[in-house]
């Protein structure tokens, strides 16, 4: 009875807020297997930012640009597209001009809302990551040292690009996205 009460409360909260998370027990996400990941051109190129180790250069840049500073995230860049509040597409950065469509995989990321209370089109760019604790958990389950992943970024990249999104779901991929583009 307690589970049913909490489940009903969650349904009510999701309906009130318009937010339905991919990990919610109310989201009946079936797993999908693809034969290959389709490719798609980006509407706007997703080019790399210049790097600096100079505080002065960074201060000069920040003085003339609106910016957000964060720790370097070593993951995989992903673009999410919502139409009228529904997640309709997720594409990797790829070469900056052409990426791979990973929508079924993004729908099982640990923290991506499948629906949001927003009318119109909303495009978010973020970084898909796997935490060090999940990286260590997954590597610890692999017996052969030669088969272990070298770093969380390699594991994340392979997880995001899986043809079977059940594997993606088990790896706890998260997307960090600071602001709309």
Predicted segments, located by residue:
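Structural signature of FAD isoalloxazine-binding scaffolds in flavoprotein oxidoreductases
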Residues: 166-176
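Conserved small/polar residues in nucleotide/adenosyl-binding loops
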Residues: 177-181
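Extended, highly charged clamp/arch subdomains and adjacent linkers
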Residues: 133
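Nucleic-acid 5′ end/cap handling module spanning
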Residues: 73, 79-82, 148-153, 157-168
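Phosphate/adenylate-binding "loop-and-lid" substructures adjacent to NTP/NAD/dNTP-binding pockets
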Residues: 1-116, 136, 154
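Short, hydrophobic/aliphatic alpha-helical segments
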Residues: 33, 137-150
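Short active-site loop/helix that positions an aromatic residue
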Residues: 9-10, 137-141, 160-163, 167
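Long, non-coiled-coil amphipathic alpha-helical linker/lever segments
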Residues: 118-129
